[in-house]
């Protein structure tokens, strides 16, 4: 356990990665020609579990000001370039976490009202489509098929969670090898309700 006050100059948050089959930490952050700062905010953790690469991501939120949106826009391009090493790998690999983008109109309760909102901007959604076109698979959407939702994040205001007015911004994306190992995928809507405004995405793999 880390006291959040000790990290007040960075983030008052902690991240945990657990495994029943053993775990090897490969690296933290991304390193590309575009991002010489190597992810100074510590938004990526790359671990390996019984042969499967697991890249945990907390993608920047651009809603606070234009400068942060510009940082987010650069960051997602860096991420796409960096993740190329995994997408064609013969080893299973997943990108997972809070990507802060609702990809399609099915992934947000009010698409018309949020067209100018960070996380649902046209260029962000186009980036997500390009990411999938490179060979990544959205496992939850593949498993449940086309439908409205399910959502993984709700605002703390206006009883959004109770009324299910949410966004799907948390994902598990897989390369071809990892996709072939998927058994099931779901959102635990009530999961984490006490401690978070997000719900966990659970994917079961046969590894």
How should these model regions be labeled?
Residues 1-7, 11:
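Single conserved hydrophobic/aromatic residue that forms the stacking wall/gate
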Residues 12-26, 160-181:
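Conserved beta strand-loop-helix elements of the APE1-like EEP
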Residues 13-15, 41-46, 168-170, 197-202:
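Short hydrophobic/aromatic beta-strand or adjacent loop that forms the aromatic wall/cage
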Residues 22-46:
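A well-ordered secondary-structure block
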Residues 31-35, 59-76, 112-116:
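Surface-exposed cleft-lining segments at the edges of enzyme active sites
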Residues 41-58:
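Beta-strand-turn-beta hairpins that frame and shape the catalytic cleft
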Residues 75-169:
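Metal-dependent phosphoesterases centered on the DNase I-like endonuclease/exonuclease/phosphatase
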Residues 185-207:
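Surface polyanion/phosphate-binding segment centered on an Asp-His-Pro turn
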């Amino acid at each position: 356990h880390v006291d959040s006050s000790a990290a007040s100059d960075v983030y008052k948050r902690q991240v945990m990665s657990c495994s029943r089959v053993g775990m090897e930490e490969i690296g933290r952050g991304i390193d590309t020609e575009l991002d010489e700062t190597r992810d100074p905010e510590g938004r990526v953790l790359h671990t390996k579990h019984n042969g499967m690469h697991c890249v945990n991501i907390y993608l920047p939120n651009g809603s606070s000001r234009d400068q942060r949106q510009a940082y987010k826009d650069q960051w997602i391009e860096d991420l796409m370039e960096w993740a190329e090493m995994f997408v064609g790998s013969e080893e299973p690999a997943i990108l997972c976490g809070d990507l802060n983008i609702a990809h399609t109109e099915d992934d947000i309760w009010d698409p018309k009202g949020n067209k100018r909102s960070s996380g649902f901007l046209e260029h962000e959604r186009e980036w997500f489509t390009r990411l999938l076109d490179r060979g990544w698979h959205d496992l939850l959407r593949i498993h449940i098929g086309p439908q409205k939702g399910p959502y993984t994040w709700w605002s703390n205001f206006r009883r959004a969670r109770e009324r299910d007015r949410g966004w799907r911004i948390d994902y598990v994306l897989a390369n071809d090898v990892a996709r072939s190992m998927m058994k099931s995928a779901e959102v635990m809507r009530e999961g984490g309700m006490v401690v978070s405004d997000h719900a966990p995405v659970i994917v079961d793999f046969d590894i």
